Amino acid sequence: MGLETEKADVQLFMDDDAYSRHSGVDYADLDKFADSGSDRDPHRLNSHLKVGFEDVIAEPVTTHSFDKVWICSHALFEISKYVIYKFLTFFLAIPMAFAAGILFAILSCLHIWIIMPFVKTCLMVLPSVQTIWKTITDVVIAPLCTSVGRSFSSISLQLSHD
């Protein structure tokens, strides 16, 4: 139990024969991990999802748990986050990708074959509608507004103090 002044790196060490090297993550050396494969998020769509232990669990300076408890909870957090993510992606990634593919195919089809032809048709018809609307405005609405304006402009009020 003590005051920590530096951010500690977490590493999980296991024997090579008991654990596969390709399924473990070395959190202390992120540069090696990032360069090991192709970038799966080149446009940084999920850069806000990088949640660390310190972002979730934080102890104020005045109250600290035992160092061993802090280290074990940190390791358990990282391992559970890693294992649960792998488990969920194993069962959900393919069905979700399939559903997203179907959804985007439907949206693309609707956009290409229904929405854009409708928009183009409206844009072709709009000049005719604009001409008709201008005629209705000039024939009906403009004289009506002019008459009402002249009627109200002839009204005068005089106030007297009695």
Swiss-Prot record:
Subcellular location: Nucleus; Cytoplasm; Golgi apparatus membrane; Cell membrane
PROSITE patterns per record: CAVEOLIN
A GO term for molecular function: scaffold protein binding
GO CC, any one term: nucleus
Phosphoserine PTM sites in chain numbering: S20, S23, S36
Record membrane topology: Peripheral membrane protein
Cytoplasmic side: 1-86, 108-162
Nucleus among keywords: yes
Post-translational modification: Phosphorylated on serine and tyrosine residues. CAV1 promotes phosphorylation on Ser-23 which then targets the complex to the plasma membrane, lipid rafts and caveolae. Phosphorylation on Ser-36 appears to modulate mitosis in endothelial cells. Phosphorylation on both Tyr-19 and Tyr-27 is required for insulin-induced 'Ser-727' phosphorylation of STAT3 and its activation. Phosphorylation on Tyr-19 is required for insulin-induced phosphorylation of MAPK1 and DNA binding of STAT3. Tyrosine phosphorylation is induced by both EGF and insulin (By. similarity).
Keywords: Cell membrane, Cytoplasm, Golgi apparatus, Membrane, Nucleus, Phosphoprotein
GO biological process: basement membrane organization; caveola assembly; endoplasmic reticulum organization; endothelial cell proliferation; insulin receptor signaling pathway; mitochondrion organization; negative regulation of endothelial cell proliferation; negative regulation of skeletal muscle cell proliferation
InterPro entries: Caveolin, Caveolin_CS
Record field: intramembrane: 87-107
The organism's place on the tree of life at top rank: Eukaryota
Modification Phosphotyrosine, positions: Y19, Y27
Nucleus among keywords: yes
Principal location: nucleus
Assembly and oligomerization: Monomer or homodimer. Interacts with CAV1; the interaction forms a stable heterooligomeric complex that is required for targeting to lipid rafts and for caveolae formation. Tyrosine phosphorylated forms do not form heterooligomers with the Tyr-19-phosphorylated form existing as a monomer or dimer, and the Tyr-27-form as a monomer only. Interacts (tyrosine phosphorylated form) with the SH2 domain-containing proteins, RASA1, NCK1 and SRC. Interacts (tyrosine phosphorylated form) with INSR, the interaction (Tyr-27-phosphorylated form) is increased on insulin stimulation.
Protein family per UniProt: Belongs to the caveolin family.
PANTHER family assigned to the protein according to its UniProt record, in alphabetical order: CAVEOLIN (PTHR10844), CAVEOLIN-2 (PTHR10844:SF3)
Protein role: May act as a scaffolding protein within caveolar membranes. Interacts directly with G-protein alpha subunits and can functionally regulate their activity. Acts as an accessory protein in conjunction with CAV1 in targeting to lipid rafts and driving caveolae formation. The Ser-36 phosphorylated form has a role in modulating mitosis in endothelial cells. Positive regulator of cellular mitogenesis of the MAPK signaling pathway. Required for the insulin-stimulated nuclear translocation and activation of MAPK1 and STAT3, and the subsequent regulation of cell cycle progression.
Protein name: Caveolin-2
Protein's gene: CAV2
